[in-house]
Every structure is written in C-alpha cells, then in structure tokens.
Amino acid sequence: MKILVTGGAGFIGSAVVRHIINNTQDSVVNVDKLTYAGNRESLADVSDSERYVFEHADICDAPAMARIFAQHQPDAVMHLAAESHVDRSITGPAAFIETNIVGTYVLLEAARNYWSALDSDKKNSFRFHHISTDEVYGDLPHPDEVNNTEELPLFTETTAYAPSSPYSASKASSDHLVRAWKRTYGLPTIVTNCSNNYGPYHFPEKLIPLVILNALEGKALPIYGKGDQIRDWLYVEDHARALYTVVTEGKAGETYNIGGHNEKKNIDVVLTICDLLDEIVPKEKSYREQITYVADRPGHDRRYAIDAEKIGRALGWKPQETFESGIRKTVEWYLSNTKWVDNVKSGAYQSWIEQNYEGRQ
C-alpha cells in the first residue's frame, strides 16, 4: 500500500511516517511545505528507506498536487498538513484560512480527479483520511461549573460543532468540506478528531515542550489564567497507531474520535513536568519556582475530553501509554535530543515567543 501523507514533517505527521516505515511494509509519499513547524530532521531515521519519498510542495498549489497524484499513484491519503497553533491563529488568522480551508479544498479536488479515473477495485479501496481536532466541538462543562454528583460529558462523534478560535473554525470548515466531498461526489473519506497530543519531536511553542525547555533554561514557565483549563492528553505515538488503523481498516464515511483517557488541568501538567525534572536533573531550587501566571488567551476553552469508545469497539485501538509513562518518555527525549531542539529554535521562533508572552505579564 502506498500512502500519501500531507504534513509529514510536522509533529503528528512525522510520527505517522515513522510508524508506517518502521512497523509496516507500506510506502509513504510525504508532501510538506516545510513551514516553521516542519522539520525533516524528525524523519532522519526513515529518510533513507526505499519506501519513503519526500515532496517539497504546498497543498494549496493545485498543479503540484495533480502532478504528485499522477506520479505516485497513492492508494490512500492521510491529510495532516495544517496550521495548528491557536495563539498564532489569533494574531494571524489568514494563514489558517489559506492552508486549513483552501488547502484542504485543493487537496480534495486533486484526490477526487485522481480517484475518479481509477478502476472499480482501486476506487472502492481508496481512502481520503482527514485528521482533525477535538477543538471543533468547542468546550465542555468544567468541574467547577457543575454539581459534583453530575457526570461530566465527553465529546462524541455526534457532538455539535461550536469552534471558539480562528484555528478551530478553520479545522471545522475543512471537516465539513471533507464530508461534503463524500456525500456529493462519493469520494471515500474518513474524519478523525483527536485530543491534545504530546511526545517527542514537538515544536516548542506548545505547552509541554515549552515548559520543559524553559525550565531547563531557567526561564519563566508561563501559565495562562489560573491554569485550570482541562485537556485530554494523547501520546503522539499512540495517535500514530490509531491513524494508521483508521486509514487501513476504517469505514468510508465514518468519523472516529481519538483520545488518551487522560484529563489533566494545565497547571497539573506543568507541576508534573517540574517534579520529573527535579528528579532527573535536580538543581538547588525546585523547577516549580519558575511558574509564572500570565493573562489568559482570548476565548480560551475550559475543558476538552474525548469519548474514544467507538474506535476501540470498531477497530480495536486503545492507547498504550498512560500520561505518567508518556510524559516521562517525553521529558527524557528532550533531555537526550538537545541538538534537534537547538536546530528548531530559530531566531523567528524566539521572536514569536517574546511577542506572544511578554505582553501577557
């Protein structure tokens, strides 16, 4: 099987590519624009494989997408290419509209034109797998807002869409496009919506890698608001396994939610990281003393939590990592891969960090 992966140099995309090349006999065509968050060093251990090809291209480039489909003749598409950071979407939404909505449209059309010319067997087996986020659902009631006797709700595959940020609105739009191409044109699509990912090779603008690296450098550990926002944390390699299971075994037209069963307050995640660093690389004072509370993000969702029962029941997937095992692996990875970290932390990254956090003190 040959799988066209978009965004395969990004955080989740590179985990998917590594999983496919290292654990299956399938081939990968990796299409990536190589924005600030795309890093080919994350694919160093698979880049020499005969089953791996890299295409430096923008999914918004229709002629390039048509050429790639015609040249490589994929059996499936896993569409992960996206702008994904909420803070960046607030200060610069245009890139999110262009990549996440227009780019998905261009890719859908390229896939549809290619798929329509396939023979019947290949048509039936072809899949267009669109990888999305639980943020399209908005947020859920927080424990502080409900009676303690009430069972807290979870996002399911039938939860209504209510995106809160430019990022989640752009992903919701792309989800709707993908489902429309299934209903209107018959393109065999699948959508997955995941909870917050963490793990190795994560670009250090997101909470967990930012906290690890700031802690090690003696910098402040910025916490939005009171830090009581709750997220369901999914180890990225568990997610990669789930995505491969969906593209190879999932049913066209279906949606599958993918979660880690690990609801944690942001402040508790940060405290856990500090305690691990105190254990592994102790210093005179606890890393907890570097925690600093900053102004909250505009429209910050208070709680996300995924009901992943469907994918477990239908496809037999479940996460292998607990949060405790996964976060330890993550901290140890960053401690052991300082060269990768140094290479991704460019001047542009430093400027963005200063712009985003200094104004929130």
From Swiss-Prot:
Binding site for NAD(+): 11-12, 32-35, 58-59, 80-84, 99, 167-171, 197
Function as written in the Swiss-Prot or TrEMBL entry: Catalyzes the dehydration of dTDP-D-glucose to form dTDP-6-deoxy-D-xylo-4-hexulose via a three-step process involving oxidation, dehydration and reduction.
UniProt KW keywords: Lipopolysaccharide biosynthesis, Lyase, NAD
GO cellular component terms listed in the entry, alphabetical order: cytosol
Record GO terms (molecular function): dTDP-glucose 4,6-dehydratase activity; identical protein binding; NAD binding
GO biological process: dTDP-rhamnose biosynthetic process; lipopolysaccharide biosynthetic process; nucleotide-sugar biosynthetic process; O antigen biosynthetic process; polysaccharide biosynthetic process
Protein name per UniProt: dTDP-glucose 4,6-dehydratase 1
Catalytic center residues: 134-135, 167
Top-level taxon in the UniProt lineage: Bacteria
Disulfide bonds: none
NCBIfam families: dTDP_gluc_dehyt, PRK10084.1
